[in-house]
């Protein structure tokens, strides 16, 4: 199947391209850049071709600066936009990237009307809403990276702390991809044992008491910590994107936490895109999965909804003047 990446010369776009090129389900990978980056884009394709030859992978690689070449794509990944700096609030990006995402969403709807749109551009929850409205697609076919990467980070930190394989950690982060994210600690388990038991007891010699607040802070600030050191996050987002894309192409029906339009499925929250667990299959989102939350988590989730909704409203008011629907 064909997958297109818009913004393929950016650091996340490049890393994502290499991840997806190695996936058997991806038969054609089309990389779209700005015209001024077309030579760099071609260089990426040539370099990637050599790498794939060494791996014995055969995939058709294409590159262009023409958005109409998304034609025939099963999935279009939007990574284009102004990158976030370490000291930049995600909301500061919204007005800059909103217009970019809105324009691409319109063109995707024109040239690839049957495709699924995966939004990566930050702030991803707001940009997912923008892409949804400007594409006119059904919400099942427009969603964002959301809290999938945040959930993976939390799993990773817990696995390292408790010295277990990451697959033994079952946890999830919902809400905003940003400071209003909500780790669902109340329903987290390791090897089938609720995390609160690990936190309160010394199950194995040498274990320190689990510092929940410190762990949550690490997840919230993970992106900023990486950006401050190397300028951008690349590999984490790329592999998380690959998880989502291959889940769809292979019709795996996995439950992943992506940013999707809320329509009352959880606590009656509506008209805002938030990270929640969904079942993903060949046609996109097959349904939102209910979540168990304690009182504090529920309150935090509602706070996240209010914050993201307010940010989204301001961006949509701006875009209504710049790019009327």
From Swiss-Prot:
Annotated GO MF terms: L-lactate dehydrogenase activity; L-malate dehydrogenase (NAD+) activity; L-malate dehydrogenase (NADP+) activity
Binding-site residues for substrate, renumbered to this chain: 84, 90, 122, 153
Keyword list, A-Z: NAD, NADP, Oxidoreductase, Tricarboxylic acid cycle
EC number(s) from the headed UniProt entry: 1.1.1.299
Top-tier EC class: oxidoreductase
A Pfam family reported for this protein in Swiss-Prot or TrEMBL: Ldh_1_N
Active site: 177
Binding sites annotated in the UniProt record for NADP(+): 7-13, 97, 120-122
PANTHER family tied to this protein: L-2-HYDROXYCARBOXYLATE DEHYDROGENASE (NAD(P)(+)) (PTHR43128), L-LACTATE DEHYDROGENASE (PTHR43128:SF16)
Role this protein plays: Catalyzes the reversible oxidation of malate to oxaloacetate.
Name of the protein: Malate dehydrogenase
Native species: Methanothermobacter thermautotrophicus (strain ATCC 29096 / DSM 1053 / JCM 10044 / NBRC 100330 / Delta H) (Methanobacterium thermoautotrophicum)
